[in-house]
Amino acid sequence: SVDSYIIARKISGLSEKTLYLYRMVLKDFFLTVRKAPTDITTNDIRAYLYMYQSKHDISNRTLDSKRNIICGFFNWLAAEEYICKNPAVNIKPIKYERKHKKAMTQLDLEKIRAACETKREKAIVEVLYSTGCRVSELEHLNISDVNFETKEVVLFGKGNRHRVSYLNAKAEVALKEYLNERSDDNKALFVYDKKPYGRLKKPGIEQIVKKIMER
C-alpha cells in the first residue's frame, strides 16, 4: 500500500526528493511499529512519534512534518477505502514556535519589501523570510517541492538532509504571482529572467538580495 501511495503522490506532481522523503518516513514507521496498515491504531502513531522524538532529540517542528506524512498516508488509505477506520483522524498537529531571524525587525522587513521592483524579487524575499531557508536551499527548490494546499515546502540541505517549512500568506501570494507570470517550463522554483531561463543559482540569488538591500 505504501508503493501505491507513492505512485499516487507522484501522479499528483510531487518531486522525486519529496517522494523519497515520504518513503523513508513511512518505511521507518512500519519497521518500528511492525503492524500491517489495517491493524494500526491511533495509539500506535502517537507512541511512534513520542519514541522517535525521544530517541533522536528532534524539534517539534521536525516531528510535526513526520506526523503530517504519516497522517497523510492514512488519510489516503481511508479515502481509497483500503481501511475502514482511519487511525490518524484524532492525531492533532504538533504545536511549535515558528522562529524568524532576530536580526531583522518588522520595519527592516517592510523596507525590503518596499524596495522590491519585480515579482521575482518579492517572491524571493517572502519565501526566504517565511521559510527561514538558506540561499543554497532556495537554489535547489523545484516547483513540485511546494505544496500550496498545505503550505509545506520541502527543503534539502547538505548530505541530503531534509526539513519541512511553511509559506505564510504573503509568501504564498507573492510566489503564485511570480509563477503565474513565467512562460518557461523549467522545474526550478526560481529561474533567470532571460533565455534560456535556467535555474537561478546561489550567486544570482545573493546578487538580487544585495541589490534590494542597497536601494
Where are these regions (language model features)?
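Conserved catalytic core of the tyrosine transesterase superfamily
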Residues: S1-R215
